[in-house]
Amino acid sequence: MKPSERRKARHCATQAIYQWQMTKANVGDIEEQFKIDQDTKGVDLNYFRDLLFGVALHCNELDKVFAPFLSRPLEEVDMVDKAILRLATYELTRRDDVPPRVAINEAIELAKSFAADDSHKFVNGVLDKVIKSLNKR
């Protein structure tokens, strides 16, 4: 598996998590529809699935990890930023095979791709505090 396959999986998972947050549809249905509608060539589909289902399953727990470091209530955080924070926090807390710096750098790149202009700074600041709270470097 190449790093680019995981990067593409994160990219797709961010979109799918966003869709799940907005629609509250069944995660399995979102996964299947995503595979039909999107070009998944070069995507680590197992990793995509793990991220999507992992975030959905552990959503409340993930929110509790990063919410204390937000500058505003969780309900006021942009849905794209929330999807990225949930995905990265999942990697930081549930994926020992992903170095913390990789999880943060990938989240920053996702924010640059999908979110508002300065979202990458917001995401970086929150996740830096998450790492410190988890005693990871």
Swiss-Prot record:
<dbReference type="GO" id="GO:0003723">
    <property type="term" value="F:RNA binding"/>
</dbReference>
<dbReference type="GO" id="GO:0006353">
    <property type="term" value="P:DNA-templated transcription termination"/>
</dbReference>
<dbReference type="InterPro" id="IPR006027">
    <property type="entry name" value="NusB_RsmB_TIM44"/>
</dbReference>
<keyword id="KW-0694">RNA-binding</keyword>
<dbReference type="GO" id="GO:0031564">
    <property type="term" value="P:transcription antitermination"/>
</dbReference>
<keyword id="KW-0805">Transcription regulation</keyword>
<dbReference type="InterPro" id="IPR035926">
    <property type="entry name" value="NusB-like_sf"/>
</dbReference>
<protein>
    <recommendedName>
        <fullName>Transcription antitermination protein NusB</fullName>
    </recommendedName>
</protein>
<keyword id="KW-0804">Transcription</keyword>
<comment type="similarity">
    <text>Belongs to the NusB family.</text>
</comment>
<comment type="function">
    <text>Involved in transcription antitermination. Required for transcription of ribosomal RNA (rRNA) genes. Binds specifically to the boxA antiterminator sequence of the ribosomal RNA (rrn) operons.</text>
</comment>
<keyword id="KW-0889">Transcription antitermination</keyword>
<dbReference type="GO" id="GO:0005829">
    <property type="term" value="C:cytosol"/>
</dbReference>
<dbReference type="InterPro" id="IPR011605">
    <property type="entry name" value="NusB_fam"/>
</dbReference>
<dbReference type="Pfam" id="PF01029">
    <property type="entry name" value="NusB"/>
</dbReference>
